[in-house]
Amino acid sequence: MKHYSIQPANLEFNAEGTPVSRDFDDVYFSNDNGLEETRYVFLGGNQLEVRFPEHPHPLFVVAESGFGTGLNFLTLWQAFDQFREAHPQAQLQRLHFISFEKFPLTRADLALAHQHWPELAPWAEQLQAQWPMPLPGCHRLLLDEGRVTLDLWFGDINELTSQLDDSLNQKVDAWFLDGFAPAKNPDMWTQNLFNAMARLARPGGTLATFTSAGFVRRGLQDAGFTMQKRKGFGRKREMLCGVMEQTLPLPCSAPWFNRTGSSKREAAIIGGGIACALLSLALLRRGWQVTLYCADEAPALGASGNRQGALYPLLSKHDEALNRFFSNAFTFARRFYDQLPVKFDHDWCGVTQLGWDEKSQHKITQMLSMDLPAELAVAVEANAVEQITGVATNCSGITYPQGGWLCPAELTRNVLELAQQQGLQIYYQYQLQNLSRKDDCWLLNFAGDQQATHSVVVLANGHQISRFSQTSTLPVYSVAGQVSHIPTTPELAELKQVLCYDGYLTPQNPANQHHCIGASYHRGSEDTAYSEDDQQQNRQRLIDCFPQAQWAKEVDVSDKEARCGVRCATRDHLPMVGNVPDYEATLVEYASLAEQKDEAVSAPVFDDLFMFAALGSRGLCSAPLCAEILAAQMSDEPIPMDASTLAALNPNRLWVRKLLKGKAVKAG
């Protein structure tokens, strides 16, 4: 996916208060009764009132071609809530709605449009509260405590459908084919779209659309749907309904990056940090039985144990996957943390990244050239930095107004407590020694001759992930680092934002009147002993970056307060999330991958063994979305990410890239 800006909808409100697109000269919904039309055309056309009680799965997936004001989604959500209230014991428990929108409304226009339907206000207010910023790609919104999931894909639907991961094929139970009229917006109503709808439709899946245009009916038939006409709503004579009565062959565009889930719903997670905590919640929400094994005596004693950590995206003009992943991960993280029903110290005070030398300033200039939404990042001149941050630096930079800091240790502990209330079982001081397959399960051998058997296993134990035979060849490395805890001063107390330079400095935590400054960086090290050299270097880096700032020289590290941790990282700065790849089988099966691309087998992996690792120094930003991606994959549900970015998160990616070029691969 190429980077491009998302333009907001160009609309006006007519005399009836109905939003009208200036670009397409068409209304977003009927002036007469848009709500009843939605119920008739899309809910009735897909027979949802009948299908919900009979649905044999816990999740029902609906996809839509044009989100617009969200009327269809809100109406469906209301109907789904009414269904759940009337059928609390039904198999169907959750709703997943996927929609595409090229020109999203602003939050203000969305709220104005929603005033048309007071009866939808309880649902509309939740949507407005989480409405995402205009970034390309998928924005996942978790609504109604996770019972309703909305995937909003911003961009051109005909481009986006070709970039969806193969794992979404045959997942859609019902299609809402909506949008501006074909005569007004012919670019959307293409055979490419109809083919994509058929590819994504589950056998037995349905579709409904307000139009009865002949080319639409024929196009959908050519794609594989069985079509019929139905009486239209109100004054409209006819509309179209369809059903996918056949099972279409499944294409596989990049089998070497194929993601496989599990038919089982019982898992063990190995680790004790933020990755484990958030993944536990994501799996429990999907009905999994989850057990956590932590080698330590308490959670968050590893890399997730710091007092303060900065939350902001990692952006790069020259790395599309990195840019796409972290921008969407950051916005998801903010939505996720804001609705978490647990307390943890945090302050969304903003983060300012400073150009303290020529190289860092050039990097910031490149980031600012990407036409980023002001909600995500804005330029800040040197003379304005003091006003924004509270301290003088003599540097210009880039500010992330929705960034800030949080306490990872408190977050991890309290999320795990919440997960325990939802059924999570935790065993502390269980150090996993090895694991092996036994009777279609995984046998876990712990220190002290303890054993356990589980259907599915997720390795999320940070830098220790490569200590098993299945993972020893992974191209990850350890990074030891020390964060200094410094007492505040009158000048430091004025710091209003997190400062990032050749290190970082947080505003004081009201809980202890200390700041965090860090962190040292020792690649390949797992040493967690206090280092006086690192303590002094943390201070000196601050002074070197801001040599004219007297407040920097007054930073006091003499009390030797610090915390040392070890992170797990990769050379491309992206997490590793997905199936644990089988190194030996990969080398054998893909020995001639450069020549056999079209005939390549699916990626060799260990069955029911997954990993969640290499979060590096940005785990607070990446962990929430990674947990959602992995839980969705494991549950065989829609994944909130495009195929190319998902490939960049695949644990086998560094091997496959070399094999595709005919190059040799080395372990580690």
Swiss-Prot record:
UniProt keyword Electron transport, yes or no: no
Kindly provide the name given to this protein in its UniProt entry.
tRNA 5-methylaminomethyl-2-thiouridine biosynthesis bifunctional protein MnmC
Query: Which catalytic reaction applies to this protein?
Result: 5-aminomethyl-2-thiouridine(34) in tRNA + S-adenosyl-L-methionine = 5-methylaminomethyl-2-thiouridine(34) in tRNA + S-adenosyl-L-homocysteine + H(+)
State where it is primarily located.
cytoplasm
The entry's function note states: Catalyzes the last two steps in the biosynthesis of 5-methylaminomethyl-2-thiouridine (mnm(5)s(2)U) at the wobble position (U34) in tRNA. Catalyzes the FAD-dependent demodification of cmnm(5)s(2)U34 to nm(5)s(2)U34, followed by the transfer of a methyl group from S-adenosyl-L-methionine to nm(5)s(2)U34, to form mnm(5)s(2)U34.
Which cofactors? FAD
Which residue ranges are recorded for the region named FAD-dependent cmnm(5)s(2)U34 oxidoreductase?
Answer: 270-668
What the entry lists under Pfam families is as follows: DAO, Methyltransf_30
The ranges of region (tRNA (mnm(5)s(2)U34)-methyltransferase) come to 1-245
Which compartments does it reside in? Cytoplasm
Return the GO cellular component terms, semicolon-separated. cytoplasm
* UniProt keyword GTP-binding present: no
Family of this protein: In the N-terminal section; belongs to the methyltransferase superfamily. tRNA (mnm(5)s(2)U34)-methyltransferase family.
What keywords appear on the UniProt entry? Cytoplasm, FAD, Flavoprotein, Methyltransferase, Multifunctional enzyme, Oxidoreductase, S-adenosyl-L-methionine, Transferase, tRNA processing
Q: One GO molecular function term? A: tRNA (5-methylaminomethyl-2-thiouridylate)(34)-methyltransferase activity
What Enzyme Commission number(s) appear in the record? 2.1.1.61, 1.5.-.-
| Gene Ontology BP term (one) | methylation
